């Protein structure tokens, strides 16, 4: 909902999603898949409407600055799943039913908690439905 809301407000939104496992966005039996499987270090797939860039990582390290450069032109860049990267201000999304430890207790860069648990917390708490307020927080100086 947040991305759609920001888009409605005319922001160009980029999202960088961290995968904790190997993944593939290309499909077997396509030319691009065969080229990549043959050993291409970088493969770019382009159509009239879409562009996808696949790059084989040499190092397991994640370079946030490199990811930001890859997403130049975005007004807002959302990183999802990068909880260990201290350089980024964070919004924690935590539902009571998931019964997970609250990240803000271990990470001091969590600026906002989005939850269905509206009990008192030492950081600001908003519900999933408060998309306008979440947007205001993202656009504030504290992020």
PLM feature segments, named:
Residues 1-58:
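N-terminal phosphate/diphosphate-binding loop that engages ATP/GTP or pyrophosphate donors
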Residues 6, 70-71, 141:
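P-loop NTP-binding site
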Residues 9-12, 40-41, 72-74, 87-88, ...:
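Short coil/turn connectors at secondary-structure junctions
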Residues 29, 60-63, 97:
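Charged helix-capping and loop-helix junction motifs
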Residues 36-37, 69-71, 103-106:
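Solvent-exposed alpha-helices and their adjacent loops that cap or buttress functional pockets
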Residues 55-85:
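Phosphate-binding/switch loop-helix module in NTP-utilizing enzymes
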Residues 76-143:
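Phosphate/Mg2+-binding loops and adjacent switch elements
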């Amino acid at each position: 909902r947040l991305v759609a809301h920001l888009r409605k407000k005319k922001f160009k939104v980029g999202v960088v999603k961290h995968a904790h496992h190997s993944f593939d966005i290309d499909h077997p039996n396509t030319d691009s898949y065969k080229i990549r499987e043959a050993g291409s270090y970088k493969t770019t797939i382009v159509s009239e409407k879409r562009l996808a860039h696949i790059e084989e990582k040499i190092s397991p390290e994640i370079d946030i600055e490199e990811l930001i450069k890859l997403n130049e032109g975005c007004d807002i860049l959302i990183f999802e799943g990068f909880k260990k990267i201290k350089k980024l201000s964070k919004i924690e999304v935590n539902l009571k039913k998931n019964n997970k430890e609250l990240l803000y207790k271990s990470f001091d860069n969590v600026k906002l908690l989005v939850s269905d648990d509206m009990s008192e917390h030492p950081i600001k708490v908003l519900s999933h439905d408060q998309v306008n307020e979440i947007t205001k927080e993202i656009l504030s100086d504290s992020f």
